[in-house]
Structures are given as structure tokens and as C-alpha cells.
Amino acid sequence: MTSVALSIKTVERPGVLSEITGMIASRNINITYAHLYVERDGHGAIYMELEDIDDRESLINELKSSSTVLDVKIHRSLEEIYGKRIIIIGGGAQVSQVAMGAISEADRHNIRGERISIDTIPLVGEEELAEAVRAVGRLPRVAALVLAGSLMGGEITRAVEMVKREHDITVISLNMPGSVTDVADLVVTDPIQAGVMSVMAVADTAVFSIEKVRGKKF
């Protein structure tokens, strides 16, 4: 059995997703990831990652035979293309410095065949930051979260605790006032070094282990 990633272009109307997933389920194929959106031309787009496929060509032919399906394309999975994700959240000045370190280190590992991608969002405000932290748990393939700011606590700290508890995501924080440093897995003073260490913590091609430094400050 094999795995496959498909992008399916469809007409945009109710019931299309149900029809497509019905075809897939009838073959005992497992859907491991799905993403739906409407393209600029008004057509529906469904991206799916599937596993336990006995006959890939037969599945694709069945999908193409549907009157609601306009096109089907095969891809490598997002895990294979973009790999693990590191999310950097906080103030713009700090986020940019953390991103510099993370991108430089990710480049070293990606050259060796690994795939690590860096996502950033500069935000201010306790409520906005807490909401963004909680939303990290709903994003796919997130391996680490870096909190890059000058003061974080309260609702942000509670959001970090939730993300760690429910999604087992490594959290690295810059050294700053506020209680968030008490719940982070690692606290780093230099923002560029924080970015570097976030990549080292999740890379399969690194010898660094977050377990050996968990709870420490640098």
C-alpha cells in the first residue's frame, strides 16, 4: 500500500466534498490531511493526503469520472516538501532577529536533505498574542514555537501551557519579563541564537537535544 497527495479541482457547490470522500472511504483509504479553499476563478480546490491505497490509478480514474471533478493532480506531501514548521510570534523587531537565526540554521539542514520551514507573524497585545499561540495547535506539522517579545505573561502563558499540554509542541522563549519564561521549554537571551536553537531542537540532522537543556536559560 502507498501514500499519495492529491489536489482536486471541482465545481463549487454543496455536496462535492461528501461525494469525493465517499469515493475514498469506499476503498478503505485513510485521509490523513485535507485542506479546502475556493480558487480565484471560482472553482473549488481540495488538497488531500491519503494513505493505505491499493490502486492509485483506479482511484484517480474514479475521481476524474465524477461530474463534479474538473482535474486531479498528484504531488509529494507537504511534509516532504515543506517539512517541519517553526512558528515565530511576537514583536516585529524581535521576530525578525529570531527568523534570521532560524533561516540561517534551517538552510544548513535543508542542504543535507532535511525540510524545515519558518513561519512568522509580528503581533502586539496580550489577547492577540494568546490567540495566535492557541491557533498554533491547529496548524499542521508545527514542531516548535518561538516567542519573541519584550514582555509576555497572563493569557499568553496560559495559551503556551495549553499548546504544550495538548499538542506536545516545543516552546522556546526569549529572555523577557513576564511568566511565559517559566513555562517555556527553553529560554534564550540572544534572538538570533534562539532561532538557531529552535531549528537544532527539531532537526533530525542535528545532535542537539531539547531534553538535555529543558528548563534552562541561556
From Swiss-Prot:
InterPro entries assigned to the protein according to its UniProt record, in alphabetical order: ACT-like_dom_sf, ACT_dom, CheY-like_superfamily, DUF5612, UCP006363_ACT
UniProt cross-references to CDD domains, sorted A to Z: ACT_Af1403 (cd04874)
Pfam families, alphabetized: ACT, DUF5612
Residue ranges of every copy of the ACT domain listed in the record: 5-77
Protein name as annotated: Uncharacterized protein MTH_1235
Lineage start: Archaea, Methanobacteriati, Methanobacteriota, Methanomada group, Methanobacteria
